[in-house]
Amino acid sequence: MAELVRPKKPKHRERPQSDDAPRIPDRPVMVNGMRLPVAPSHSIQHQRDRSASPEPEEQVLSDTGESINPEKENGSIQDVRSSPVRPAPPPPRAISQEREAPPIPARNLVFPRSTSMVAESTREPTPVVLPKRSVAVAPYPTVPELAELPSYTAALKHPQVYPAVDGGQLHHSRSAAAIPEKTRFSAPVAQERVREGEAPPMYPSINTYERNEHGLMTEENLVTFYHNPLYEHAEIFVDQFIKAEVVPNQSGSLFPLLARLKSVCDLMTVSEVKGKENTEELQKCLRECWVQQTMSVEAKGKCGDNNDGTGRASYFSYELQQSVLDQMKRLLSTNRTNLLDHTLCEETSFRSLALQIQWQIIIINNNFMAENGLTTNCPPSLVATGPMTPGRTAIRTALSDIFYHLRYPRLSKRFIDTLFGWIKELTCILNMRQSCDDGIFLLCHLLRLPSPIDHWAPPFVQTFIQSQSPPRLKLDYCVALLTHLLNPIKARESFLRHVAQSEKEESTWEILADDDDGEANEFSFVTINESDLTAFLDQIPISELYSIAYLAFTSYSDKGSQFTAMIAFQLLLMKILDNGLTSYSQPGYKMFCKQIGISLKHSVRELCSNWRLIRDQIRPGEEQNLQKEVDRIVLLALNYLIHRDSVGLFQFVVALPYGVVSEECRSRCEYALRSNKKMSIHEIYETPICEVRARISSQSIAKRVSSLGAQDSEFLINSLASIGSYSNGDVGQLLKELIDVCFCEPATRDDFYKCGGEAIGQILTKRPETLHQLLAIVDRNLQHMDSYAINVLSSSRLFECRLTEPMISIIGKWLINNPPEHGANRLARRVLSGLHWGLGPDGQNLWIDVDVHAIAADTVVKAHSVHCSRSNSMISKSISKISKLASKVGDAESLFQQFCWDLLVKLKLPTIPVDLVQNDLTAHYVRIVQNYEDDVVVYLEKAVPLLSDLVSSGSSVASVVLLSRLIAQHYQKVNLMAADKNFMATFERLLHIDQLPYAVQWLSGPSSTPTPIVRLICSAISYYSAKLPPRDYLRAWITLLCQARTGWNEDAVTYQIVGTIARIAFINDTQKLYEITSIVFQAYQQQMAAEKNQSKGILALFSSDSSASPLIPDSMLAVSPFASYIMLRVEQKSFNPFYGHFYETLGKKDKYNLDHAAKKAASKCSMALPVERLAVFRWAKLVIVCKDSALLPIILQQLAGQAYRLRKANNLNLCYARRLIDEPQMQGVMAECRKAIEETTVATKGLSKAVVGWLFTKHEVTRTGFDFSVFDLDYLLQLILAGDKNMWMDFVNMPHFTSEEFAERKLYSVTCQLSPKNRESPSPPELGSPRARGTAKPFPVLPVHSGLPKAPCLDPSTIFQQHVVLQMAAPFMSTVKNLAKQYTECGDRMDIYDDAYCKLIRILYQSTQQTVPVEIRCSYCSKPKPCTMTVKPNVLSPEIDVKMSQNRQKRIEFWNELNASMIDQAAVATASMEHLSRLVSMMAAALDPRNRNSVQPTGHSLFYLITSSVGENELLFSVASESYSHSLRALGEEFVKFRPEEQMDVMQLALNGFVLSEPLVEVFTAEVLNSDDLCTAYRKLSDAVRMPERSKMALQLLGEQ
């Protein structure tokens, strides 16, 4: 349909009507050069190329509908690859003969598109048409959002090395191919999109195409839907590439420069080695110049006994080694030579050559950009292959030259990095308008470079998926890249002949790598590295290929044809990937083969994912045929993967999309997996389906795994399970085989029990109804499974399974008859624990039948009574005995008991009257649930004793569940519960059940605050408060917790539970809190009354503290912010009479402090409060401990209100904020409060800062005319003063409390499985390949040459002006002359430094007078006499040592200055000189003969100007002499060679002893002289031969040497 969505051309054309539809054109025999894997035959069917639909502006319509292409025929390989589009499949004759062909409506009326897509449809380069084929470039719409990514559209800021292409500079380049097509025809199209039309079917139904006996389309017809000319001519391209590139033609301008650069780098490597050796020798020589020697001196005299004696003393002295010093002089001379003649000159030569090459590359890139109308900001784009233009030829030649020089052995890193930078620069420019052949050309070069190159080469291989090129062109290009990458690399050894020869000459090989089998592999740079191949393959992700394919095939008119094209593309892609597996199925390429396997798997999954989405949109008659094609692809992929030995591809068989294939295909896949014989796809299809199923039954898994490795066997088992999970047939036989092989057979189960569990998990996930079969099979084989039974369901998700009565009987047998540590018992627990015991998806009915719940409970009770006798012995025992019995319960029994309780609380048991009570804890639970929960009176009478036993035994979870259910059902009768002493005693013990060390902990790990059981109680309250009327339900809990208990306000557990209740009340009733404060108030009043009665006793007379106890102690404030908030509100309400007298006393006199007022108030009422118990300070303490609580804004409101609220005293409304807050004895509390508010992490929208300003200000806010604007949020403070008591809910994060509520509610719901099951089953994994994050590297970025010197530029007219050219060259020669002189002087100066250094070495050790101790002894001296002697040893002179260091430092500084001043200047000057000479020669060579002679004087003058500039210093400076030699060579080739008038002068110059005679000899061509001049020249040369000083040169000119 691509032709139907092109915009209408301005010129109106009408398509003539045809009486008959066009006949199907004959196709050539050979198409695409490929063998698509067709079953049952793979033979290549040859066919002719058919015509494609031409563009309107290119076609001439006739009655026969045939299009004629007026373009010239071109048989080159570039033309062959030019077609980026897919030819349209012709309609069959049978259909076209029955009706008249309908007229095709105008393009703009069919399928109108968005403006961006219309504009995109015009972005098509001019096609190059094949001989005898009409090819039209079809407009493929692109996705605008892909083309607008920053990596493609962001402008790059470059210096003016590459000039911008403006309107006034390159008008000559504005051809159809050069102008960006983005603006072409876009405006008219936008105006023509007026109405919508229904396009007639352009392609017939795919049912009309020929199929083989298996219902599969033939290769001939599949090629009709997808034809790739680039793939077809891949072999031809490679052959031509090898022919052209294996031997360099040296025609490029870069080749001689690169050759010189390589030589310089080689010399630099050698010089670097020599320099290091010289440095080491100098250091060694310096150490050996002075040698330490031991000297001795003898003394004679009298000893202490006055006898004649002698004494000897030894000392050290250093002696100069003259021979070593002479060697030092030679080494220093060598060092100077190495630094000057090698390091400096070679570095200068390197930079000079690199600069010349860089200038050449910029010229090449500028020519390419000008030729194609590009700028440096153009994004990458892919174009169809067209004729080779000069600019494209130059850039490819430059790349060839660079790649050639990368194929030498032992290249230096600097050389490689430099060449890589130039490849990057050339490729960046080429990417702006890269043809398909260019990309393949690059890949072919990269594949023939010495490995490894994976660290820099991959970015040069790109898919251009996000460019605005036509999708079909990009698709063909990517397929071609894959083809060249995965095919065997032809002639790699020939390209790397230099490397191979170097390796061959080495006498030994170094083993660098071992393969996975432990065998040593010889490493060779000629053999391509696996990492290189993997890196290139990563650049062509399968997901990107399919993204392009989806766009490329949208031109088909219907989904059937579109998907058929996808099938043809997929078959071709699979063939290419299989070629890669065939080429690299070797141990050294295992990871690469795995990467190919991943690509193959992803491609199949992508196709099947697309098929799953569109199969409902296919025509009714076509769906079955396309399903067969999908079956073929999956079966073919499986066959490719399982027949590659030792490369680890079996793992990818598991993930093939068996769910979208037919049942017959699944059977054939299973048959191929089970078979020990390698079968072709032909053999698999030829086997009848009945025979396939019979062979499946006869070929066991055990026999198959014996012929495979352990890893492949695991993947085989999982693959068979994956097929079985999607199968519609019975999987009983498969399950039996899995149980036998993986869990029963001793020889195999150690290897396969894990994968067996995974395989069974796959089956149960997709077919949960097979659980019954599985349990029956396991039950029959249980005695053979031993401890492996537990692994059967280790990876299974049983939430989707349902349990039936026969199944529970099997499980019950395992559970009761086997001890807890037995595998069968553990397996039974795994099944029962993994099931969903709650409601179904409808939320009304149970997922598992209620009768099964009752049977399961009965089974658990029986099992518990059998296996938990020690736990049951705790029933009706005292606490001390229970503790002793609990210590004897083993770990296995404890775990089993925990399982029983976890399961029982999930079961939904019906009400069944039972009179008999078993002496078992679980039976107690079941009896309570089934008999006593309906009537609270009966519950208190009969169930409470049973509940008490559960609590005493530590059955915490079950006890909490029973208590929660009771209060939820009978919360309206809470007073009956509160009045029952036994119930309240049990309730009290349950609240603290976590404190029992033997309690069955519901959560592992140490108890936290709150404890796990307290959290479960809080969760139950949250859950039921959402199901019941919350007011009465929460008040019932408050009644039990506070009103019915004594000492409750000193219990942390109570505050934790009350905190949950208060939070629920705060969320739903912010102001009144469901009036739970009234219940707490009554409880507190009762407590204070009891305390008051106790204070009337005799002991109260001896107590000085008459104040009432606080409702909540300070130590409990941090337990729960919500509980503390409620308690403080109740507490301040309880002391209202005290506060009335307190504030009245304060208002009488300002001198009264708080302590005095409190005492006065206590004397006037029956209650007393100390200052620290005042409400404002209690709220301040709560702020300190709750600074990070989300309730902080409300607490701050209470604090500010208590401080600033007006109090009525003596008929006046007074504010006591300053007197309260500034109380001296409470300054510590208030300072801590201020710090807590300032450090809070709660977002209070500025309230924290405002409250700090209010509380700690010095202003008296109640004075007349006070300006409240000095405060933040001053309106809130004014509301407090006005008596407003509304909550400041704007500052409270209510969603935080709500989320806490939902999270807390979930705990109890999950524990008891009270939530309905999810309506939707877990969706199968996505079939498509992952697209989240790719490993492909992005396009290379064009480098910026900010400080690059400019190259000499010549205008074409300048070369006719001799003086101008000479003036340009003169500065360069002058610079070289000065630098050469400086170079010579520097050598002399370094010589001076070295001479001075040697002289310093000679005097480094100097003779110094010293005294040494000597003892004079006689023969048997008992009293030696000490004395001293004077000696003169040579010792180190510190002053000389410092001077030597200074000498070396000055030499280093001088050398650094020399480098900085000379290298860059010399490099630029010599490079400019050579570049100018080369430029003059090239421009002269490009002139026609008439103008050429006019330029001869310019070249002649420049040539002899250079010869006259060569002096003594230039000859010593090798950089200058080499530069002059190459400049003379370049000029001589054009202006001297083969020119008679120049030969005599050149000969005479050479004979006169010109030192740089080599280029003169090369350009001396005497054969062009006339006879007289030739005789004269020969006579002069003959005479010169007889002269010793000229003999050698004369012979060279004569060609004798």
From Swiss-Prot:
Major subcellular site: cytoplasm
Intrachain S-S bonds: none
One GO term describing the cellular component: cytoplasm
Residue ranges with Basic and acidic residues bias: 15-26
Renumbered residue ranges of the record's region Disordered: 1-109
Keywords: Autophagy, Cytoplasm
Compartment(s) of residence: Cytoplasm
Keyword Kinase: no
One GO process term, biological-process aspect: autophagosome maturation
Domain of life the protein comes from: Eukaryota
Family classification: Belongs to the EPG5 family.
Protein function: Involved in autophagy. Has a role in the degradation of protein aggregates within autophagosomes. Essential for starvation-induced autotrophy and omegasome development.
Name of the featured protein: Ectopic P granules protein 5
Native source organism of the sequence: Caenorhabditis briggsae
